[in-house]
């Protein structure tokens, strides 16, 4: 558990990261169609506030009050009803909203990797030193009824998202490429979900050539060892492990 000074420093680092990568700005541009004419709060700022809320340990929308209590650090934070209205508006056209948000994330990631220079995950990627994308499904417990929550194969209840993380190499961690939301009863070895997650994660890679070949390595556990998924990867010419 972080003490108060350490937590404050960590959150200051995150807010500076948002500014340095331009994520809030890119989201604001992408979400212009969802901004009301006389709105006080920007949709891009609202979404990054929700991300920060999760980083400080929140697990529901009401926990954004943690940020609202520190305006000197986080700036003006929208009220719960305003946040709820934005999410309702985004949910009215999920495909369009997800596409806009994904585009903003890709642009911000490009900014971040440009700043990282030769430390960026895609710097000097070769067949012998490929950019690695890790795929894995993970169980997320829901303690009460939620939209799309369902029983899972381990006897639990909740969600079963498929995740794709871009590996940062030896001695480092990684970053989320994409997370495919799925109900708890989704299969671990569903080939179509593996393919969709792979495609969405590759769409997040800045300046990726149309046929990167073995400069990309897709790494997964045995759940990804289905004929359909492996056939798809081999047709693309990507390395697998």
Task: Label each residue range with its predicted role.
Residues 1-187, 192-211:
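Dynamic "connector" segments at or just before major functional cores
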Residues 130-134, 215-217, 239-241:
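Structural preference for beta-strand elements that scaffold enzyme active sites
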Residues 230-239:
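Short, surface-exposed basic-aromatic patches at helix termini and helix-loop junctions that form
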């Amino acid at each position: 558990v972080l003490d108060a000074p350490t937590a404050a420093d960590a959150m200051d680092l995150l807010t500076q990261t948002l500014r340095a990568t331009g994520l809030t700005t890119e989201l604001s541009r992408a979400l212009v169609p969802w901004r009301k004419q006389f709105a006080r709060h920007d949709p891009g700022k609202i979404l990054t506030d929700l991300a920060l809320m999760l980083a400080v340990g929140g697990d529901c929308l009401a926990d954004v009050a943690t940020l609202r209590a520190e305006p000197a650090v986080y700036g003006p934070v929208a009220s719960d009803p305003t946040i709820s209205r934005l999410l309702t508006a985004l949910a009215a056209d999920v495909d369009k909203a997800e596409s806009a948000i994904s585009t903003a994330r890709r642009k911000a990631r490009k900014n971040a990797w440009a700043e990282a220079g030769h430390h960026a995950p895609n710097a000097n990627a070769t067949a012998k030193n490929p950019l690695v994308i890790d795929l894995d499904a993970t169980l997320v417990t829901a303690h009460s009824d939620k939209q799309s929550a369902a029983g899972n194969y381990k006897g639990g209840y909740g969600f079963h998202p498929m995740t794709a993380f871009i590996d940062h190499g030896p001695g480092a961690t990684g970053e989320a490429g994409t997370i495919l939301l799925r109900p708890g009863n989704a299969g671990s070895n569903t080939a179509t979900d593996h393919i969709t997650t792979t495609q969405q994660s590759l769409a997040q890679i800045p300046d990726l050539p149309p046929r990167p070949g073995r400069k990309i390595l897709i790494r997964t556990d045995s759940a990804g060892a289905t004929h359909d998924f492996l056939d798809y990867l081999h047709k693309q010419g990507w390395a697998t492990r």
